[in-house]
Amino acid sequence: MSLLLEPSHKQIKEEKLYQQMGLSDEEFALIESIIGRLPNYTETGIFSVMWSEHCSYKNSKPVLSKFPTKGEHVLQGPGEGAGIVDIGDNQAVVFKIESHNHPSAIEPYQGAATGVGGIIRDVFSMGARPIAVLNSLRFGELTSPRVKYLFEEVVAGIAGYGNCIGIPTVGGEVHFDQSYEGNPLVNAMCVGLINHEDIKKGQAKGVGNTVMYVGAKTGRDGIHGATFASEEFSDESEEKRSAVQVGDPFMEKLLLEACLEVIKNDALVGIQDMGAAGLTSSSAEMASKAGSGIEMNLDLIPQRETGMSAYEMMLSESQERMLLVIEKGREQEIIDIFEKYDLEAVSVGHVTDDKMLRLLHQGEVVCELPVDALAEEAPVYHKPSSEPAYYREFLETKVEAPAITDAAQTLKQLLQQPTIASKEWVYDQYDYMVRTNTVVAPGSDAGVLRIRGTKKALAMTTDCNARYLYLDPEVGGKIAVAEAARNIVCSGARPLAVTDNLNFGNPEKPEIFWQIEKSADGISEACRTLSTPVIGGNVSLYNESNGTAIYPTPVIGMVGLVEDTAHITTKSFQQAGDVIFVIGETKEEFAGSELQKMTEGRIYGKAPEIDLDVELARQEALLAAIQNGLVQSAHDVSEGGLGVALAESTFGTDGLGADIQIDLDSEASLFSETQSRFVVTVKPEHREAFAAAVKDAKEVGTVTNDGVFTVKNQEGQQWIHAAVNELERAWKGAIPCLLKSEA
């Protein structure tokens, strides 16, 4: 839209055009009062994206303030591109998770691909080299053609971008549930490594210093992407394909290498990715954080389309772009580095001392706004919150153990449920070995990468069981953090910190805001108990389709430190004769379980209980046993319960089986989802030492070499007798089989 066609100040107000950009009447009146005049079209657009939920967290700030964000090893908490945690030896790990839900529902390949690209830029803009990508994906039931299409395209988009840029995708999770039918979730996490002296911040310091634009040219793609991500899906959403950006991983690879070289040059003052809200957010946020202002001449912005207006340039979310602040007079040093990588680097403005964002276009001042008003002074809403009617009903509903006539058949069916089934079809499309640092590939409890030149390694995971959160968001929030930590510990690592992605429905509905509040309470309590501070994250609200919300899905990304690569542990049984232990007692808890969903087609009842002090004690005892060389394998018990965890531990073991005798109330208890449990194997000579070290561990059987999975009760009655290769075939074949089948 050219300047000549843009609505006047008066039209914007009288025709309430600001509402189309996502601003309310009250917000527009507040803008008028802050700047002392009516904003023009460009300024209205700038305020609308900066004050969107996606950029300002205006609905979620009161909830986010509950999270513990400080810790002994935290070098950078929330507020920058990514969080940073010290791991010793002058090194730190940098990580962050972000959502690209709305774009992925409309244009799944590009939506997922650019989600990966954006989170990688967040990490390298801190000065870190990205070493791994993970993801957390949610889709509807894998029986409808639409869901199959979204699933295949999202995975292809993640693979296409990650593989081209040369960063391994080492882990993640994929869940399928009716609640995501119209609104899939695509959360991407990136982990990077950095030396302390290389840490950079997104700040525009030093009056007179040069503001430099680097990377791809600006086009019209992604305009109002941040606003689009702050509203519910409707039939009109399909028309917003232009709000989905297009990614170029080869450009990103060049940008990554060039930026990491530039970061070593002391001419660089500040650097930030142009992510949500593009040029607008990067310039306003960098200036606001530094207590300065920025003036830019938009005629100098590299453009790939003709006749772009100031509004379009400032709101574009074209990918692979960075904004830098360079020491005045040293611009050529930086330009030379980017030219070496065949990248455009252009001086487009300078830092000022008046705390204003001033934009010139075609000889006119087209924007003059206070940066703090944009970046810090969005209204904060304390939304009404009310407990949904179903919650009390669930608390008071007794869930009986499902009647099971054939436990072997039930186990096989559970292994074929898409949420439990092997995700090999997914991760086989990812290059998870590129750069050759991957020690534990996708498919175990966590991805593990060694840190070259040291004995250390990093374990990483994403976790969330949204069914528990639907039943009880506070308990479910605790479980999400605890399960992530369990996965880290099972890999031989000490949990360090959390990055969270809060995916919820429309916060303007009191029962949805209640879910957000309660889950944050649960997450906060678990993070405090387990000493895993929240160092950053993302909020994605308005995940609704035709008025129906997704299950509350606060995904927990967690990273842990393996002190010695000799401690790295996987879920797979290692050798015949090893003794199998289960840590933790099993209760009859079926609400929200995979078994309940499979047998009854719905979930209801009281969520499984969790005692965080017990959880911590078991995790610490298991980690100490691993570090003391007592453990052969370790696997957390999650979806599908003990039966599934034990069976999974036999898969991929080249002929091993298991002979289990266990004291449980019923066959159904094999599939109960009681929390804080682990399946562990130890060598026979370590049996007594392990039992003494881990108080809640009970011996339940032996690893065999006959390739048979056998489970008996205490009386010796056989519940399951099945060939491991048959179970594994069912588990591995489930997703490919569903994708091929006609709905």
UniProtKB/Swiss-Prot annotation:
Q: In which pathway does it act?
A: Purine metabolism; IMP biosynthesis via de novo pathway; 5-amino-1-(5-phospho-D-ribosyl)imidazole from N(2)-formyl-N(1)-(5-phospho-D-ribosyl)glycinamide: step 1/2
Q: What is this protein called?
A: Phosphoribosylformylglycinamidine synthase subunit PurL
Protein species of origin: Bacillus pumilus (strain SAFR-032)
Reaction(s) catalysed by this chain's protein: N(2)-formyl-N(1)-(5-phospho-beta-D-ribosyl)glycinamide + L-glutamine + ATP + H2O = 2-formamido-N(1)-(5-O-phospho-beta-D-ribosyl)acetamidine + L-glutamate + ADP + phosphate + H(+)
> Which residues are catalytic?
H54, H100
The UniProt record gives the binding positions of Mg(2+) 2 as D122, D273
Keywords tagged on the record:
ATP-binding, Cytoplasm, Ligase, Magnesium, Metal-binding, Nucleotide-binding, Purine biosynthesis
Q: Is the keyword Ligase assigned to this protein?
A: yes
A GO molecular function held by the record? ATP binding
- Residues recorded as binding ATP, renumbered to this chain, are Y57, K96, D500, G537
User: What is the protein's known function?
Assistant: Part of the phosphoribosylformylglycinamidine synthase complex involved in the purines biosynthetic pathway. Catalyzes the ATP-dependent conversion of formylglycinamide ribonucleotide (FGAR) and glutamine to yield formylglycinamidine ribonucleotide (FGAM) and glutamate. The FGAM synthase complex is composed of three subunits. PurQ produces an ammonia molecule by converting glutamine to glutamate. PurL transfers the ammonia molecule to FGAR to form FGAM in an ATP-dependent manner.
Q: Which domain of life is it from?
A: Bacteria
What are the binding positions for Mg(2+) 1 in this chain?
E98, N538
Q: Where does the record place it?
A: Cytoplasm
EC identifiers of the protein: 6.3.5.3
Could you state one GO biological process linked to this protein? 'de novo' IMP biosynthetic process
GO CC terms in record: cytoplasm
